[in-house]
Amino acid sequence: MANNLPEFTQELINQIKNSKQIILFLHLSPDLDSIGSNIGFLNFIENVNPTIKTKIISKDEPSENIYLKIKELTGNKLEIADPQSYKYEEGDLAIFIDFPEIQRTTTNKDFKLPEYVKTATIDHHVFETEPPFLNYIETKNLSAASLVYEINRQANFVLKKDYFEFILMGMLGDSGFLKHRDQKFVQSLSIIQKYCEEFGNENYFKIIDFLESHKPLEEYNLQKVYLNNLVYKNNFAYTSMTNNDRKNAGVSHTFSETTNGASLIRNIGESKFVFSVTQDLDDENLYRVSFRSCLGENFQVRDMAVKLGGGGHLLAAGAQFEASNVESAINLVLQTVHELNGFWG
């Protein structure tokens, strides 16, 4: 069942009612949309069954201020654990929000959930694989959080203020604070308007202040590394971050940054696109690449991510792959860039 919002919503309600425990997941290196959409979805679950057990599993810990806000709202629902080692004893319904498959939550690409766990998906990315039996995929939406809003509204569930705020965080994060091109831009504005009508303009600006203010020094030290490692070409630019870079910059191994290297450099010069390569914190042979278009619809980056085994949006995409060192990782990306676009680094 796909892309029929009323049918999907009703079937999801039925599945939750018949489940013992709901398992949600944050994808690797969770961004604001991953966090906001999953926390916002708790509003839906609590309206269906306020007593059902619910866990949110994340291999990577969110940034400190976000993590504390989640703990304050949800108690112990968020558990920092690798999904492949988590004990799915009572968990019989897994809901993937903002990613298409369980492999996006762990570094083990062969990991699968136990067979008795049913799955459902709420996503705004283009699928490279067959989606689960129950799914709502809407690629015109710029964020998964906006889909969570739609599902709550379809069910006529009133959004609690705290959950509504996490939904707005997800929307703002994936839209670049409403700066990215969005086919449903007016709808995004209407969701914000709804929040302001219910809770006041000042509370909306408090969300902005929370997301933009009081960044720790380590965040700026990471940005300095990305800028120091910047390489600019006529058609594109790229940067990188290794674990040694982090250590030399005085950034702890456990620090969870919010800066995306590609987003940081996306407006440089006459670049058509940019990318960043980062080393995994736990697996030194695993690297992640993030692509960002600098020209909107006039230059799409998703094909490069797909070529490297990933996916995403036309204008923002990513992948992860193995390499012996950062130079090899960058060269693999540059080779892909050349094969698909004719550019050489």
For the regions a protein language model found, what residue spans apply to each?
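A generic local secondary-structure boundary/capping motif
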Residues: 83-85, 108-111, 135-137, 157-158, ...
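An acidic intrinsically disordered interaction segment
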Residues: 1-12, 110-119, 140-144
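Active-site cofactor/cluster-binding pocket
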Residues: 74-134
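Short alpha-helices
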Residues: 122-193
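Acidic active-site catalytic centers that drive phospho-/nucleotidyl reactions
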Residues: 31-33, 98, 123, 174
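Hydrophobic helix-and-loop "lid/oligomerization" segment in the mid-to-C-terminal part
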Residues: 3-28, 34-76, 85-93, 168, ...
